[in-house]
Amino acid sequence: KSIMKKLKIEIDYDFCQLDELSEQDLNLIESAKAAVKNSYANYSHFHVGAALRLHDGRVVIGANQENAAFPSGLCAERSAIFAAQSHYPEQAIDALAIVAHNEKGFLSDPITPCGACRQVMLEMEDRYKQNVRVLLYGTSGVYILKSVKDLLPFAFVDENMRK
């Protein structure tokens, strides 16, 4: 008879204020904040902006786009990633910043991506064999994660289908 083992998953992440960020990371968050203006969120009134920095330093933005048939919309993160992959498929993503704004303004707590976006973000790490730093903005501060895997600990990637 085997004995069940109790296992634990922990992640390390940083929490900082905007004035503690590098100029490059601050600019990425500011680009994501500017992208919120391109959001079409007539139904939820929840506007999300994303900005990603490619390996060559180029920044690509995305904003959520809602549709009356809710599954037909697209989140800001995937909007930015798919735009980057369509225009610059040879460029890995080094970092991704996400911000959100409701009817009261930017959220106090850092915004986190939905499960579908986490999976697409993870695919970029797997595709280019490098981590994507994730910056999650709130007016109270910024969470910084070293890898998308920190958001998706039981990750499903191509390798899982080959074992």
Predicted features along the sequence, with ranges:
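C-terminal binding/interaction regions
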Residues: I3-N38, F82, Y88-K163
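Short, surface-exposed loop/turn motifs that are enriched in glycine and acidic residues
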Residues: L18-S22, E66-P71
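Short loop/turn motifs at secondary-structure junctions and domain boundaries
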Residues: A41-S44
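Short beta-strand scaffold segments in enzyme catalytic cores
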Residues: H47-L54
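A short glycine/serine-rich beta->alpha loop
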Residues: A63-F70, E103-L107
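A short mixed-secondary-structure module that forms the rim of ligand-binding clefts
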Residues: N67-S86
